[in-house]
């Protein structure tokens, strides 16, 4: 391959790899393994308020993890609004069917400010580690709607990417607004 792929080319390649991965039947087992590593991390262990997400097809399955940990920590999930992401407290009785039938918090779920979050884990289409000779730098490529691009700068806590191994790439094209992540569980 010559030159760097565009973001759209990477998204198309990931979509094809996602179809193959989902057909393999490994999504649930791999999700449990990845989230097991996340929950053993000191960043998660010390956090009282944790921002997660409800998975869409091809992402690490998080719903049972969030439900289980909501008994011990304040778990938040985003609500997509026209202006971006609102952080809402996870409460099983405040979930409604959202985009593609994915559960999301209703507007009645308690709202949380970004500065209240102690730890966040986020999905992505692709991730890269240590590109351009910067070891430890973790970059994320999203779906192209910039929801997390607008949210991440307002979080003042460790932010981890969670993804299946096929989503790790050598390089991602970066924009000035891209923010590196602190951790990656893959």
Language-model features, listed with the residues they occupy:
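Conserved phosphate- and dinucleotide-binding cores of soluble alpha/beta proteins
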Residues: 85-186
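N-terminal active-site beta-alpha-beta segment that forms phosphate/nucleotide-binding
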Residues: 2-115
